[in-house]
């Protein structure tokens, strides 16, 4: 399961943070809808049965409806026999907390670190220490430079080709890593923006192109935000 950051912008005269996030709750039940047709589910069952004799035997004498019920756990069907779901297709979280793992992520112009503040009070100056650390990370992971005395190889989940494809250069990587950004953004009108879906264990399903576009354009959310809006960092779990 995954934790990730969301910057929620609220207007004092608009919806609250809780109201903005509610439509994206995994626990929100929606009007029954066809997620997959009965043919799609049965095709999936048949593919698995081709390579599993025990499974094939278990399903051999079941009706199509019984197969679908057993396979999906669904007990709602439309008039054509398609399984119905009440799972929220816009689900983004099963629980969340303000700050959380990213407590005090926002730096104000007064030098304080907080979970929320007015947009006009944000200090968006790139972090010099993070910039230098990112440069060194690239040198060790992408350029395969030797470790210096006292250094340890940094933890890394990706191949060097991933960094080259997404960031192109060491300097661009360091610039992006040292500037403020979050995985997703929710605006006061309720729109949710993200580069891709968040999967298990913090792995984004977004491709390099969507990630690159997000990195390059994230600042537009801040530039276009009303200075008197409140920005809050939320730790979402899915």
Language model: regions and residue ranges:
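Acidic (Asp/Glu-rich) sequence patches and key acidic residues
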Residues: 1-217, 224, 238
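C-terminal or internal capping secondary-structure element at the end of a domain, subdomain, or sheet
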Residues: 228-238
